Amino acid sequence: MFVATQKSLMEPDPGMAKLVSLMEGSFSSEAQAVADHDFYDIRLEMKRIWEGKGDGGVWLYVEQATATALDKPYRQRVYHLTSSTYRSGDGAEKRVFVSEVWMLPGDPLVYAGAAADPSKLDKLTPAELSRRDGCEVWLVMAADGTFAGSTLGASCGSDRQGAVYASSMVKVNPEGLTTWDRGFDASGKQVWGSVKGAYEFKRRRAE
């Protein structure tokens, strides 16, 4: 379990800059969907927003849609990235990056396409968002500059399809990212999400 120290989140952090550079962009699971029809062709967009808000964190608008309905994303979120330190089991102090999940107000489709046109979020402020407590992903940077992490235990509540909690496992690297989101019932049985493994999102190169 991570235990954050009192080290300031406001200090410059090159690891944060690296993480943001890897997360921001356009991604697709098309290659995975072609190879295995149990996976859908999903497009993932992440765009940095609200720069200079002064809280020391980074905000990302996040949008996921099937390739056949790009104008109707099925998931829209705002991630708030911060960093702190924690002590590992051997007592060593290490850096951890926390990706909080925030929900948009009202009808999220009003903001569809905001990754390409961030001006759609100009009138929206962080104070209008609602946080999904316990659903933050805790990421650690490896020696090769990649990141990996997950939600903690059963902290992320969910009532979707009979679930009582959800879990997310994430890996981020220069080629893209993998995400494995699953829901579990009170007995620990998986009730939604991929049963074959993580979705593999490859970075889409500018044409």
For each feature predicted by the language model, list its residue ranges.
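Calycin-type beta-barrel ligand-binding domains and close structural analogs
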Residues: 8-37, 41, 65-207
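N-terminal glycine/threonine-rich, aromatic-flanked beta-hairpin/loop signature
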Residues: 44-74
